[in-house]
């Protein structure tokens, strides 16, 4: 194996903690474009990490947090051969100081995560994950999030008809 020089550029805003929605766009070696929709805001603690922190977890080897790696594997894709793009919007809600507020905020963001994953699938993006959530959708917050992502994923444009 020969050494190579790799490069990663990112905006400092990616370091802000709080509740974010994000989309991974993965260009696989076989030219497929795959997508993964996620959020920050733990289900098991009061933490709402930054997208930067979550990025490393997604592609790492810890079984409880490497969901992107798992989905790529299920699609027969080796991450080392891919090109990645992470688009994150947030923080749409601040990190909470107590568990009850954290859970309320997490649930609002989870509803938006599910709606965005479904909207991207309907728009023709090959979304690898199905977000399972029964929480109520905050429609106005979702509209803002969808519009923000539509700037990067144009087929998400709201139906104006």
Give the location of each predicted region.
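Boundary/linker segments flanking structured domains
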Residues: 1-34, 40-161
């Amino acid at each position: 194996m020969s050494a190579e020089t790799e490069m990663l550029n990112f905006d400092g805003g990616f370091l802000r903690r709080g509740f974010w929605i994000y989309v991974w766009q993965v260009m696989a070696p076989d030219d497929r474009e795959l997508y993964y929709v996620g959020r920050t805001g733990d289900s098991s603690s009061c933490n709402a990490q930054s997208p930067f922190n979550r990025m490393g977890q997604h592609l790492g080897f810890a079984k409880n947090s490497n969901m992107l790696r798992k989905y790529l594997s299920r699609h027969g894709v080796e991450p080392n051969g891919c090109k990645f793009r992470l688009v994150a919007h947030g923080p749409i809600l601040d990190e909470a100081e107590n568990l009850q507020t954290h859970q309320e905020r997490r649930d609002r963001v989870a509803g938006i995560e599910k709606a965005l994953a479904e909207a991207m699938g309907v728009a023709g993006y090959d979304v690898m994950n199905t977000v399972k959530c029964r929480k109520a959708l905050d429609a106005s917050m979702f509209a803002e999030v969808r519009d923000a992502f539509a700037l990067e994923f144009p087929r998400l444009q709201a139906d104006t008809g």
